[in-house]
Amino acid sequence: MYLIEPPFFVLATQNPIEQEGTYPLPEAQLDRFMFELRVDYPSREDEERIVNETTSDETATISPVLSAAELLQLQHLVRRLPAPPTVVRYAVQLARSTRPLDPEASADVKRYVSWGAGPRASQYLVMGAKARAAMDGRAAPDIDDVRSVALSVLRHRVVVNFQAEADGVEVERLLSLAERPARG
């Protein structure tokens, strides 16, 4: 056993096109990642800079942006922000609305989803909303903060069934449908 000093977190990459040579993570392990972020191709200028920096003999210079202590302070700051009951209620309702057996799930979620987001999704919706509010200089998150992080928090937690794949229904569409009941 190794003691890992805080702050400790894991970043992982996954190539959405080619899975050969990689081992897909089971849903239970994917659920431990707070966000799934999609990264688009870089701009022409950024790609040229990447090529120049990675094909030369020069060693890249990396400068820290934050110390470990500063990062821990920011993490504690986010946790100290209060989440209003309306935000917690919305996050829980949104996560629950992705579950096909939940009475408030939409007909499409019931038809196309095999497995919806679990309680960890509700936690991460609130934590993501708190972080967004903190970055924006606000003392507490609101429902719009939850909405802004919802796709990144939920996308990798919702498993569609064969019918969804056959009908060309993607997770992103189902999440927009799942959000509708929670808005009321």
Task: Name the predicted role of every residue range.
Residues 1-81, 130-132:
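Canonical AAA+ ATPase core
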Residues 25, 46, 66, 86, ...:
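Alpha-helix N-cap and coil->helix boundary residues
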Residues 50-51, 91, 149-154:
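Short alpha-helical scaffolding segments that buttress acidic/His motifs in well-ordered protein cores
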Residues 61-122:
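Conserved AAA+ ATPase small/helical "lid" subdomain
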Residues 100-184:
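C-terminal engagement/docking regions of AAA+ P-loop ATPases
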